[in-house]
């Protein structure tokens, strides 16, 4: 990946984990954005706590960087219980999951990131654990092997995924609470940027926070990452204060434009417009054209372009919309303006 793709990638960098942890809100009262999720959890969590019960199992899904891990920490904090954290790829054998489950305290939260990547044999162990609070484990080998049931304490499983469609129906149906995280509105990102600036002890003008928020692709993780790079620029090239002008210059230096697009976003859009005449084009063809992996396009680049209306999915493949043409100052091709898109621009 290029430097600026790293800057606007919603994927978490290993070096960011400690910084991100210090910036995460610990309580629902400090949680910004996702109003529907917040409103629901403000009912479910106190209800479970008042009854001294484990919260129902929670599935959180949405694009990377929107706060799935943060929300899991908040759930544990609000329930005043321990959080045990792991990920789907780490749980290679049923015994790995059994070890975690049998060491939980009553009402603890077990957080499994990338839960769609659980192996089928591990997932089979999870079903009775979620539903009946029991697991079956094998003791011994060969003819002497036998299965025994272990009772588990009440617990809450919080599963997070960017690919909810890859979850099996039996697993998905066992979650009593399902929360979808959406891209953040600019005004919510401004609040997040201002909060982070206060924690980092930065001097920032409102317009500076707005400029960073506008270019953050609706993603808090990207907003915080860009803020730290703007701080570097302000301290070296300015007086340390983040103004709108300072933010603009810093983000232009990082090649992040006013829409939050970086080189790879523009490369993908231009490939659709110039090499494939606006589409429709398959993802594999796009991946080959821009030298990127299919998974990166589907999970990292494409979601924001779809949400912003620059790309649309059709049964025949991806198509560029009129927004994409206008962004590059090109005249939309007639065949590239389907009726449902054309109706949005009656005066053009």
Swiss-Prot record:
Its EC number is 3.6.4.-. Residues 1-184 are annotated as: Large ATPase domain (RuvB-L). InterPro entries: AAA+_ATPase (IPR003593), AAA_lid_4 (IPR041445), DNA_helicase_Holl-junc_RuvB (IPR004605), P-loop_NTPase (IPR027417), RuvB-like_N (IPR008824), RuvB_C (IPR008823), WH-like_DNA-bd_sf (IPR036388), WH_DNA-bd_sf (IPR036390). Pfam families: AAA_lid_4, RuvB_C, RuvB_N. The RuvA-RuvB-RuvC complex processes Holliday junction (HJ) DNA during genetic recombination and DNA repair, while the RuvA-RuvB complex plays an important role in the rescue of blocked DNA replication forks via replication fork reversal (RFR). RuvA specifically binds to HJ cruciform DNA, conferring on it an open structure. The RuvB hexamer acts as an ATP-dependent pump, pulling dsDNA into and through the RuvAB complex. RuvB forms 2 homohexamers on either side of HJ DNA bound by 1 or 2 RuvA tetramers; 4 subunits per hexamer contact DNA at a time. Has 3 domains, the large (RuvB-L) and small ATPase (RuvB-S) domains and the C-terminal head (RuvB-H) domain. The head domain binds DNA, while the ATPase domains jointly bind ATP, ADP or are empty depending on the state of the subunit in the translocation cycle. During a single DNA translocation step the structure of each domain remains the same, but their relative positions change. Homohexamer. Forms an RuvA(8)-RuvB(12)-Holliday junction (HJ) complex. HJ DNA is sandwiched between 2 RuvA tetramers; dsDNA enters through RuvA and exits via RuvB. An RuvB hexamer assembles on each DNA strand where it exits the tetramer. Each RuvB hexamer is contacted by two RuvA subunits (via domain III) on 2 adjacent RuvB subunits; this complex drives branch migration. In the full resolvosome a probable DNA-RuvA(4)-RuvB(12)-RuvC(2) complex forms which resolves the HJ. This is Holliday junction branch migration complex subunit RuvB. It comes from Nitrosococcus oceani (strain ATCC 19707 / BCRC 17464 / JCM 30415 / NCIMB 11848 / C-107).
């Amino acid at each position: 990946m290029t430097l600026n793709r790293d800057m606007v990638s919603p994927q978490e960098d290993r070096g960011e984990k400690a910084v991100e942890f210090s910036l995460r809100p610990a309580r629902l009262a400090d949680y910004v954005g996702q109003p529907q999720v917040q409103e629901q959890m403000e009912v479910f969590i106190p209800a479970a706590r008042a009854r001294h019960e484990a919260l129902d199992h929670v599935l959180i899904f949405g694009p990377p960087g929107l706060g799935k891990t943060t929300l899991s920490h908040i759930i544990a904090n609000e329930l005043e219980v321990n959080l045990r954290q792991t990920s789907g790829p780490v749980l290679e054998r049923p015994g790995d999951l059994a070890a975690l489950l049998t060491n939980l305290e009553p009402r603890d939260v077990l957080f499994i990131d990338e839960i769609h990547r659980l192996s089928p044999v591990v997932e089979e162990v999870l079903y009775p654990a979620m539903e009946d609070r029991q697991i079956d484990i094998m003791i011994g080998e060969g003819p002497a092997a036998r299965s025994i049931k272990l009772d588990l304490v009440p617990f809450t499983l919080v599963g997070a995924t960017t690919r909810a469609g890859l979850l099996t129906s039996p697993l998905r149906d066992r979650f009593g609470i399902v929360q979808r995280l959406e891209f953040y509105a600019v005004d919510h990102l401004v609040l997040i940027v201002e909060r982070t600036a206060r924690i980092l002890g930065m001097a920032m003008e409102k317009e500076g926070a707005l400029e960073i928020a506008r270019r953050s692709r609706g993603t808090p993780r990207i907003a915080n990452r860009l803020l730290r790079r703007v701080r570097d620029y302000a301290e070296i090239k300015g007086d340390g204060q983040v103004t709108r002008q300072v933010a603009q210059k810093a983000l232009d230096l990082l090649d992040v434009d006013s829409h939050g697009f970086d080189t790879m976003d523009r490369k993908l859009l231009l490939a659709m417009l110039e090499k494939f005449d606006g589409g429709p084009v398959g993802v594999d063809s796009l991946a080959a054209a821009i030298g990127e992996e299919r998974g990166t396009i589907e999970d990292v680049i494409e979601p924001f372009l779809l949400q912003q209306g620059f790309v649309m999915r059709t049964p025949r493949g991806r198509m560029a919309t009129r927004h994409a043409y206008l962004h590059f100052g090109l005249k939309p091709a007639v065949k590239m303006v389907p009726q449902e898109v054309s109706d949005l621009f009656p005066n053009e």
